[in-house]
A protein has these predicted regions:
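Internal gly/pro-rich beta-alpha loop/helix module
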Residues: 1-3
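Conserved functional hotspot residues or short segments at active or partner-binding sites
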Residues: 68-173
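Glycine-rich, aromatic-lined ligand/substrate-binding cores of catalytic
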Residues: 11-17, 21-100
Length: 177
């Protein structure tokens, strides 16, 4: 990524060497011995992170302020299920999490089989719930942040137009080929 994304000043490139790891092959599972962030405490959170991170530009909490960040999602505004959580100022975490002290209703994903890679199904589903409640305009609370997290403005526009995940992904194919 350092070369491909142009991270070095003056369009410099660095010479990179891939060193094969003995006894490991692509596809082998691996569990990090140390959590990469207080908000990514386990393999489940790490696996769900790509799909849940874009919620940070919306009215939906990703569970910051709980002991299960990026494993629970919800909002005080909707009641998708009886599952609820209450973000609080926990030691070693954000002192002011979204919806601090309020019950959020949504999904417990702690034992859910996470999608392989990035999925828009959760974002699309929650957006549709807000739209059904007549609150579509309240869903993207930080639209520029959402756009930055997903890489462009087009995805947000496609979601608000009612496109399916498959239709949105199809638009990426040309760029991937």
């Amino acid at each position: 990524m350092i070369n491909g994304e142009g991270w070095l000043a003056g369009k410099r490139k660095c010479k990179l060497t891939v060193i094969p790891v003995k006894g490991w092959k692509h596809g082998d599972s691996y569990s990090l011995p140390v959590k990469p962030s207080p908000n990514l405490p386990n393999d489940q959170a790490i696996a769900l992170y790509p799909s849940l991170c874009p919620f940070e530009g919306t009215a939906i909490s990703v569970g910051r302020g709980t002991y299960h960040p990026f494993q629970v999602i919800g909002s005080p505004d909707i009641r998708l299920s009886s599952f609820r959580f209450k973000p609080e100022a926990l030691e070693g975490f954000d002192k002011n999490p979204m919806y601090k002290g309020q019950y959020c209703y949504g999904n417990n994903m702690k034992s859910l089989l996470p999608p392989k890679g990035f999925s828009l199904r959760y974002i699309i589903s929650y957006y549709q719930e807000y739209k059904n409640m007549g609150k579509a305009d309240k869903f993207f609370t930080r639209p520029q942040w959402f756009d930055m997290l997903v890489g462009n403005r087009k995805v947000r526009r496609q979601i608000t137009e009612g496109k399916s995940e498959e239709e949105i992904r199809a638009g990426w194919q040309k760029e991937l080929e």
